Design a protein with these regions (language model features):
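Basic, flexible Lys/Arg- and Gly-enriched helix-loop patches that mediate nucleic-acid binding at interfaces
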Residues: 1-237
Length: 237
């Protein structure tokens, strides 16, 4: 269910603020009944009229993108940089589910379905996010143990569910480490490694929930299947 004013705005009829004004003015009907309360929630099955005109509901769209470097995870950018939304040709008002840093690559979901996005981002869903990080320096067991014990970020102790050293390159003094987290704090993975003394040179999200980058090259995307969408809704607690 979504708020009435959001559904009206999503249909393209007017802005959300104007939609709120129309609701309080008694110019909106839901299933033939005038509604004036802004907190009213509606479903896809409800019939909504604005000033006696039936609105066309926005069709829900769901995408999986292999985000490339040098693209911002927003719907617009005041610096004129390319956004993740620019990479997907659609008229739907899609937006990213969560965010990846400008130079971070990998799994990113986009949709215009607020409920779908909220399920994936809500802490109760405990969605796993798997990252591969290239670190400056060679991480040791003591550092991995320190991460597993938990590090303090934003006055909160956060712990990865898994940390694995995958590759060591003594010639370049770098290593590849796979780390799995549940939270989605700002710059979380980079800050976690920095807390134990390592700079992240490259970062890629390999997986989120059950979505991975199979058959998707950098910058490519695909639509989710109805089965995948239903599986996300099954995560709701």
């Amino acid at each position: 269910m979504e708020r009435l004013q959001k559904v009206i705005a999503s249909s393209g009829v007017t802005s959300r603020r104007k939609a709120e004004e129309l609701i309080t003015a008694g110019k909106v009907k839901v299933n033939g009944e005038v509604v004036t309360e802004l907190g009213t929630k509606v479903t896809d099955k409800d019939r909504i009229e604005v000033e006696n005109v039936l609105i066309a509901k926005e069709v829900k769209e769901y995408y999986l993108l292999n985000k490339p470097r040098g693209v911002v995870t927003t719907t617009s950018d005041d610096k004129g940089r390319k956004t993740v939304v620019d990479l997907i040709p659609t008229n739907a008002r899609i937006y990213p589910v969560g965010r990846l840093d400008y130079d971070t690559t990998g799994v990113l979901l986009l949709t215009n379905d607020g409920d779908f996005a909220n399920i994936l981002m809500h802490p109760a869903s405990e969605v796993e996010k798997v990252y591969m990080a290239k670190l400056k320096g060679i991480i040791k067991g003591e550092h991995i143990n320190a991460l597993k014990d938990g590090v303090k970020l934003d006055d909160q102790i956060v712990k990865p569910s898994r940390v694995k050293l995958k590759k060591v390159d003594p010639k370049t003094n770098t290593c590849m480490v796979q780390i799995t987290i549940h939270e989605g704090k700002n710059h979380q993975v980079k800050r976690m490694f920095e807390s134990v003394g390592f700079e992240v040179l490259k970062l890629k999200r390999e997986k989120e929930a059950f979505f991975d980058l199979k058959d998707l090259q950098s910058g490519e995307f695909r639509k989710l299947t109805p089965k995948e969408v239903a599986k996300v809704y099954g995560l709701q607690k």
